[in-house]
């Protein structure tokens, strides 16, 4: 995982509420264990017609969405089953942060383990983002703030360990492995 301090990007806005993990990446794409290439399956049933052609009216298929790394989603994003493929698909598609008023706990935990920043904002700040698709936004992980299109900032919660991992580019296992020598010394002293 790469360290994440600040994400600056235009936003792509997906105002649908209760987007579940099966909508993020349908079950038929879950037969792989490699994260690479899953971005093509992101929102597949909404992005592509039955013949596989891109639907030009879907927000992520529009030219202005290209290169955006911040997804502004409706309330209760990532609900449904535990599916680590969902954050894998988002990250593989270039999304670095998801902003909503509520993000499902299991999705949030999976996102953090995979370098995707889950940002929960108050309703008023979120409404400003929903009303300004394509606006430039800054997510500051270190300060735990989002700079909104009007220049104001909104704070978002992030527990200390998750913040540490994002800022240092490590996941939980990487953190534990980095402590291996200290753990061995502690265990050796107990014998």
Curated annotation (Swiss-Prot):
What's the superkingdom here?
Bacteria
Reactions catalysed according to its record: (2R,3S)-3-isopropylmalate = (2S)-2-isopropylmalate
Q: Which Pfam families match?
A: Aconitase_C (PF00694)
The reply to whether DNA damage figures as a keyword in the UniProt entry is no
Top EC class of this enzyme? lyase
Alphabetically, the GO molecular function entries are: 3-isopropylmalate dehydratase activity
Pathway field of the UniProt record reads: Amino-acid biosynthesis; L-leucine biosynthesis; L-leucine from 3-methyl-2-oxobutanoate: step 2/4
Q: Could you tell me which InterPro entries the record lists for this protein?
A: 3-IsopropMal_deHydase_ssu, Aconitase/3IPM_dehydase_swvl, AconitaseA/IPMdHydase_ssu_swvl, IPMI_Swivel, LeuD
Name the UniProt key words of this record, in alphabetical order.
Answer: Amino-acid biosynthesis, Branched-chain amino acid biosynthesis, Leucine biosynthesis, Lyase
Q: Name one GO biological process term.
A: L-leucine biosynthetic process
- What is this protein for, i.e. what is its function? Catalyzes the isomerization between 2-isopropylmalate and 3-isopropylmalate, via the formation of 2-isopropylmaleate.
Which PANTHER family does the annotation name? 3-ISOPROPYLMALATE DEHYDRATASE SMALL SUBUNIT (PTHR43345:SF5), 3-ISOPROPYLMALATE DEHYDRATASE SMALL SUBUNIT 2-RELATED-RELATED (PTHR43345)
Family statement drawn from the similarity comment of this UniProt entry: Belongs to the LeuD family. LeuD type 1 subfamily.
Describe the subunit structure.
Heterodimer of LeuC and LeuD.
Q: Would you tell me the protein name for this molecule?
A: 3-isopropylmalate dehydratase small subunit
Which taxonomic lineage does the organism of this UniProt entry have?
Answer: Bacteria, Pseudomonadati, Myxococcota, Myxococcia, Myxococcales
């Amino acid at each position: 995982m790469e360290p994440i301090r600040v994400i600056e990007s235009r936003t792509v806005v997906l105002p649908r509420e209760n987007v579940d993990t099966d909508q993020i990446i349908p079950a038929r794409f879950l037969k792989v264990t490699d994260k690479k290439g899953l971005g093509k399956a992101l929102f597949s049933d909404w992005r592509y017609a039955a013949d596989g052609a891109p639907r030009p009216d879907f927000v992520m298929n529009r030219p202005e969405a290209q290169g955006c790394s911040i997804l502004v989603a409706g309330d209760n994003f990532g609900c449904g089953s535990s599916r680590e493929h969902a954050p894998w698909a988002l990250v593989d598609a270039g999304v670095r942060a998801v902003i909503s008023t509520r993000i499902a706990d299991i999705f949030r935990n999976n996102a953090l383990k995979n370098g995707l920043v889950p940002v929960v904002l108050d309703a008023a700040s979120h409404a400003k983002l929903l009303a300004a698709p394509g606006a430039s936004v800054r997510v500051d992980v270190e300060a735990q703030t989002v700079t909104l299109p009007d220049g104001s900032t909104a704070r978002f919660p992030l527990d200390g360990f998750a913040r540490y991992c994002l800022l240092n580019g490590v996941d939980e296992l990487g953190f534990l492995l980095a402590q291996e020598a200290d753990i061995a010394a502690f265990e050796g002293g107990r014998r």
